Amino acid sequence: LNECKQLNENQVRTLCEKAKEILTKESNVQEVRCPVTVCGDVHGQFHDLMELFRIGGKSPDTNYLFMGDYVDRGYYSVETVTLLVALKVRYPERITILRGNHESRQITQVYGFYDECLRKYGNANVWKYFTDLFDYLPLTALVDGQIFCLHGGLSPSIDTLDHIRALDRLQEVPHEGPMCDLLWSDPDDRGGWGISPRGAGYTFGQDISETFNHANGLTLVSRAHQLVMEGYNWCHDRNVVTIFSAPNYCYRCGNQAAIMELDDTLKYSFLQFDPAPRRGEPHVTRRTPDYFL
């Protein structure tokens, strides 16, 4: 799998069944111990995921926490998600994989994963095995009780982590409501709650982040979901950090990627990286459409 090779259809089915058994036991707020390296969107950029492991350390030597969006937009969604799920099955205590807004049946039919499965396997079975598995992915993680990690952001219907623990996550990502918000929301310069330009989730201001962190005894909300040119970006007076781990996103954005290392004492440091050198990849001119949900 490390050589960007595919499994056959039956192997994928078996892999997904095994992964379900493991993920079923995990919480909506999955507890994670430091040291751990926290990663943002990967989006099927397999060679850049290899670069991430080169920079951050191989699994299982390094503990990893991925905050979703493994598929769509990049050319190697199949190989990327297969590898991450295989690592989860092999080293369940060493890697945590959360759900992103792209780990959904609906979104993957628009942004590439469905078409890629069809192209590589000749039918939609592999897409079905993976999207069924996505329903089992934990929504959020909590590192040593202090750093709260999730794909998108906060929700007006959630005040405490216990509210999240009480959600039924075994379903397709809904169009609205708390589960949707956790995967779709974005921090914003404006205070309070706002309508999201994405058409799902909300924008939330610094007042919201500070209140949430204080109420839940947190020092930081770590999230992904937004392209940031340096690979990471602080906002809300360091109550929130955005981490994005797909360099030169969509093979055309020119951004750096980053990962956040948390040591034994929860001290953080960021490692930035550029795209892996590429050979023989098609040149992209097509503009990928932005969300129109």
Swiss-Prot record:
Reactions catalysed according to its record: O-phospho-L-seryl-[protein] + H2O = L-seryl-[protein] + phosphate; O-phospho-L-threonyl-[protein] + H2O = L-threonyl-[protein] + phosphate
Organism for this UniProt entry: Sus scrofa (Pig)
MF-aspect GO terms: metal ion binding; protein serine/threonine phosphatase activity
The enzyme's E.C. designation: 3.1.3.16
Active site: H102 (proton donor)
Protein name: Serine/threonine-protein phosphatase 2A catalytic subunit beta isoform
InterPro entries assigned: Calcineurin-like_PHP_ApaH (IPR004843), Metallo-depent_PP-like (IPR029052), PPA2-like (IPR047129), Ser/Thr-sp_prot-phosphatase (IPR006186)
Family per similarity comment: Belongs to the PPP phosphatase family. PP-1 subfamily.
Disulphide bond pairs: none
Gene designation per UniProt: PPP2CB
Subcellular location: Cytoplasm; Nucleus; Chromosome, Centromere; Cytoplasm, Cytoskeleton, Spindle pole
